[in-house]
């Protein structure tokens, strides 16, 4: 069916939704009044700094903080020894915040210090004496999978393989997805193209570095202000790491200067809380740019193999991929998402994807714009382009011939509902840009991509004020204009002007639990 622009027109005529009003945070941001993490302050505040390992892999034999603690202006020092035992699922989080037995990557935090000013804190950092035993390191995902690779965790056995291996390795997890008979599918192909790809880790590059302010009270309760994509997750994580009741910790999200998935976890927040607890004063920590790049999570680097078979008329008979993703020094690379996304745009009867979650001496990876999907999609789409060119087919026509649609079988089990891929491809081909002549130095590319959407837990409070305005309390930090979206929807449903709705991001003590702002979920979930 050819694309019909009229079919994409609104089913319902909206009065407010679809307009372009001034964002609730717009004026404050462009005039400099908005408060970001680094703008926060408190009476009696101390400055926190973090000592980081200069080695990619080293055993920590001893940490001597006595000289630093005796230095002028120093009020507290914190190491991993200050934190108690935590449940298994949080051990890696704590170890990433402060190294325990080993430094697992260059930039791994080893100790934190709180002093009366920046100069005193920086001077005291140089007085912390760490006795390192330097160990062999590995940073490349394929090198880490080799038989003779230096092991980050000598007791780690790969999960997902049956029967389980008897020897440890740097492969944390293995998975397989797919359906059909791949061998038979490749036998039926007239052309088979197999290619290998490597992608490097890419940092989110948010403009604002991580920043927080922690303040412990004498009764054991605490306040924490930080730039984050999910302050409820920060509350739950920090409370458990610091041995607190969740209700004793209130977290407030500051304005956020970019996140892109990289601010969905904790790095300096537990350290600031511990320093505040030990010193009895508020403690503020702001990462510098070197800290951000060395110690916070980029995407995974990868090594991938993709194989696709097609008939002469352009029908894909089989697809296969091997995906090796490194998750930094801790398990958790998003290889499963990569495997689920790789061939999602194509209707394949025969499909097999294998994935390896590999640890290396790098910072722990963090989410970045559809974590895991762009890498595997890049590999598959590159092969798809090559096949289309070999067949002499238009690249969109080849994709249309094989595109997933309602009822197509996904690699991970369910069948797709209405996804609109065919309509999108038809619209792209019908657009004048696709057939416009190219000037020297110009090119034109085509690719398909896939990502999930999920609801998650969300709580919103709506109150009618005495003056007739509407107060909206949201629990999802605004990283993409969600305050404006919520105001638009509230105004639409209540039949009032947009400027009569006021939205705030509430703290964790003022609203029910909210999941993080990620995965394109907030407008969908909070708007319901």
Which residues fall in each region the model found?
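Structural alpha/beta core scaffold segments of enzyme domains
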Residues: 1-528
């Amino acid at each position: 069916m050819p694309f019909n622009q009229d079919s994409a027109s609104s089913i319902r005529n909206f009065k407010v939704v679809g307009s372009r009003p001034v964002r609730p945070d717009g004026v404050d941001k462009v005039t400099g009044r908005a408060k970001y993490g680094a703008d926060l302050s408190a009476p009696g505040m101390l400055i926190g700094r973090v000592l980081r390992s200069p080695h990619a892999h080293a055993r920590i034999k001893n940490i001597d903080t006595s000289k630093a603690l005796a230095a002028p202006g120093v009020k507290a020092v914190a190491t991993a020894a200050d934190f108690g035992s935590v449940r298994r699922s949080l051990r890696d989080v704590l170890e990433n915040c402060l190294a325990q037995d080993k430094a697992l990557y260059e930039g791994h935090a080893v100790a934190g210090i709180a002093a009366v000013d920046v100069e005193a804190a920086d001077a005291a950092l140089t007085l912390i004496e760490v006795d390192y035993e330097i160990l062999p390191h590995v940073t490349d995902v394929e090198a880490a999978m080799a038989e003779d690779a230096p092991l980050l965790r000598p007791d780690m056995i790969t999960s997902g393989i049956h029967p389980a291996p008897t020897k440890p390795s740097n492969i944390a997890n293995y998975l397989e997805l797919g359906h059909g008979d791949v061998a038979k599918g490749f036998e039926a192909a007239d052309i088979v193209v197999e290619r290998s790809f490597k992608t490097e880790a890419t940092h989110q590059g948010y403009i604002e570095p991580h920043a927080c302010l922690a303040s412990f009270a004498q009764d054991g309760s605490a306040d924490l202000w930080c730039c984050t994509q999910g302050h409820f997750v920060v509350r739950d994580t920090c409370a458990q790491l610091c041995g607190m009741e969740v209700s004793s910790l209130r977290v407030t999200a500051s304005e956020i200067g970019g996140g892109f998935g990289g601010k969905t976890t904790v790095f300096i927040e537990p350290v600031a809380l511990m320093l505040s607890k030990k010193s009895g004063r508020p403690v503020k920590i702001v990462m510098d740019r070197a800290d951000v790049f060395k110690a916070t999570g980029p995407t995974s680097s990868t090594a991938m193999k993709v194989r696709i078979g097609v008939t002469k008329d352009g029908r894909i008979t089989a697809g296969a991929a091997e995906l090796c993703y490194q998750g930094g020094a801790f398990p958790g690379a998003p290889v499963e998402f990569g495997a689920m996304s790789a061939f999602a745009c194509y209707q394949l009867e025969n499909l097999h994807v294998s994935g390896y979650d590999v640890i290396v001496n790098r910072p722990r990876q963090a989410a970045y714009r559809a974590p895991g999907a762009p890498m595997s999609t890049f590999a598959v789409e590159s092969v798809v382009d090559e096949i289309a060119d070999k067949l002499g087919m238009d690249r969109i026509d080849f994709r249309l011939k094989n595109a997933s649609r309602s009822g197509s079988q996904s690699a991970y089990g369910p069948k797709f509902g209405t996804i609109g891929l065919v309509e999108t491809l038809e619209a792209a081909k019908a657009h004048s840009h696709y057939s416009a002549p190219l000037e020297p130095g110009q090119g034109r590319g085509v690719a398909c991509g896939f990502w999930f959407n999920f609801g998650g837990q969300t709580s919103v409070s709506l109150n009618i004020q005495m003056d007739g305005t509407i107060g909206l309390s949201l629990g999802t930090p605004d990283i993409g204009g969600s305050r404006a979206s919520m105001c638009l929807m509230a105004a639409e449903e209540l039949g009032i002007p947009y400027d009569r709705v006021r939205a705030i991001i509430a703290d964790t003590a003022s609203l029910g639990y909210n999941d993080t702002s990620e995965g394109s979920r907030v407008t969908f979930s909070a708007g319901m």
